[in-house]
Amino acid sequence: MAELYVKPGNKERGWNDPPQFSYGLQTQTGGTKRTPLTKRVAAPQDGSPRAPETSGPPPVDHPPPSSKASRPPPMGSCPASGVDPPSSPVIESETLIEDVLRPLEQALEDCRGHTKQVCDDISRRLALLHEQWDGGKLSVPVKKRMALLVQELLHHQWDTADDIHRSLMVDHVTEVSQWMVGVKRLIAEKRSLSSEENKEEKSTVAPENQTIPGFQPSS
């Protein structure tokens, strides 16, 4: 290939003159032409504009919307309206004054023949109880405990009735102090009367059970 780049020597020159190189052949046989760096790239044939290349940060993917936002509200959780639901009726029996005073007055009549003066004071105390009950000055707990006290009194449970009396004096002394003294005295008088009646019954039954010595009742 060297002979392609060397021109034949000039016949007029000497034998030792250097050969002349042919630069035209080098450009003809050289590699492929390089595209000049200043040449612009042709626009695409379809006519669509090219998106400008930006060097900003990549777009951030937003999370999908929460499914709670589109979920319908559960049944029964409707927004509260201005109308309040009707309140449930209170199932509670009212303690009647007759259920308390009538047994107390009956117990008072049973004791009146024994201690009249004491029973007169008890009667005045029971009148105060009646007045405060009708006047709405007694609370519901006091009324309920008095109903229990009367039931224990009717069943001759003296100790239990006395315990209820003491609890009322401790917990509600302001309400019951004016008339509870009479109730306490009535419990004591009723207990004493019951004890005397029991003794009389025992003394009456004893002679009937006695037998005459040496006498056998006929069968």
From Swiss-Prot:
Record's subcellular location: Nucleus; Cytoplasm
UniProt GO BP: apoptotic process; negative regulation of myoblast differentiation
Modified residues (Phosphoserine): S48
GO molecular function: steroid receptor RNA activator RNA binding; transcription coactivator activity
Keyword Translocase found: no
Span list, region Disordered: 1-90, 192-219
Tissue: Expressed in various prostate cancer cell lines.
Comp. bias intervals (Basic and acidic residues): 192-203
Comp. bias regions, Pro residues: 55-76
GO CC term, one of those recorded: cytoplasm
Function text: Functional RNA which acts as a transcriptional coactivator that selectively enhances steroid receptor-mediated transactivation ligand-independently through a mechanism involving the modulating N-terminal domain (AF-1) of steroid receptors. Also mediates transcriptional coactivation of steroid receptors ligand-dependently through the steroid-binding domain (AF-2). Enhances cellular proliferation and differentiation and promotes apoptosis in vivo. May play a role in tumorigenesis.
Assigned protein family: Belongs to the SRA1 family.
Self-association and partners: SRA1 RNA exists in a ribonucleoprotein complex containing NCOA1. The RNA also forms a complex with PUS1 and RARG in the nucleus. Interacts with AR.
Name of this protein: Steroid receptor RNA activator 1
Organism taxonomic ancestry: Eukaryota, Metazoa, Chordata, Craniata, Vertebrata
